[in-house]
């Protein structure tokens, strides 16, 4: 699946190099690579964590579509390990059931950065990778592993969507990170197009 032949040898070489790099850093199912990938510093930018607004999800799509599922599966670990905490966050902060994730996750259920930044979509964004993975492979063992997470994401949106005049709306979810000052100046975000797309796919 991952073999290609291109007219441009430089692009072809970069394609294989990108696969090699991704596979090299994404072999341990408990410790996927962080936002910086292969780079490390004493004081890493963005806390060196898993930023789950899109940064963590995107590289794994490349691995999945080329058939490298063993290397793409580590994507799921930070989400699955934090389910209990995110369920509690949802109950305390939003007063309903479901999985509500902060923006920055660490390994083994660690919240390394408890910022929400008026975003409700990180959990469903991660769910899409799981849905794509199952859609490509129809791997039932994988589906059983991620089903509780997907169910928790569904519970969240069933409770959080706001119905007005027979139409459901996404309220309080920004397309991008929003500060409290931004919300004061511009109002509560509603119906961000990315989240609408995630929900339609979900």
Question: What are these regions, as identified by a protein language model?
Answer:
Residues 21-26, 77-90, 149-164:
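Long, well-ordered core segments of solenoidal/helical folds
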Residues 21-24, 56-70, 120, 124-139:
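Alpha-helical support elements that line or immediately flank enzyme active sites
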Residues 1-49, 69-73, 81-88:
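Acidic/polar, glycine-enriched structural segments that form the non-catalytic walls/loops
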Residues 44-50, 58, 64:
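Long, structured ligand/cofactor-binding scaffold of large enzymes
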Residues 22, 61-62, 70-74, 80, ...:
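Structural recognition of the beta-strand scaffold that forms the well-ordered cores
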Residues 14-17, 21, 75, 79, ...:
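Alpha-helical packing segments of well-folded alpha/beta enzyme cores
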Residues 34, 40-49, 96-143, 148, ...:
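The feature captures the catalytic groove of carbohydrate-active enzymes
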Residues 4-11, 15, 52, 56, ...:
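Solvent-exposed, acidic/flexible segments
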């Amino acid at each position: 699946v991952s073999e290609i032949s291109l007219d441009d040898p430089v692009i072809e070489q970069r394609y294989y190099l990108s696969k090699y790099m991704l596979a090299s850093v994404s072999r341990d199912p408990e410790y996927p690579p962080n936002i910086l990938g292969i780079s490390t510093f004493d004081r890493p930018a963005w806390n060196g964590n898993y930023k789950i607004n899109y940064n963590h999800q995107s590289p794994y799509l490349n691995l999945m579509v080329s058939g490298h599922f063993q290397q793409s599966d580590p994507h799921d670990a930070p989400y699955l390990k934090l389910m209990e905490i995110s369920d509690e966050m949802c109950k305390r902060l939003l007063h309903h059931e479901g999985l509500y994730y902060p923006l920055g996750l660490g390994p083994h259920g660690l919240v390394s950065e408890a910022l929400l930044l008026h975003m409700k979509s990180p959990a469903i964004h991660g769910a899409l990778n799981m849905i794509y993975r199952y859609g490509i492979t129809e791997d039932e063992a994988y589906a059983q592993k991620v089903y509780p997470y997907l169910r928790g994401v569904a519970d969240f949106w069933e409770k959080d969507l706001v119905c007005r005049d027979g139409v459901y709306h996404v309220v309080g979810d920004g397309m991008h990170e929003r500060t409290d000052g931004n919300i004061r100046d511009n109002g509560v975000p509603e119906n961000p197009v990315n989240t609408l797309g995630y929900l339609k796919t979900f």
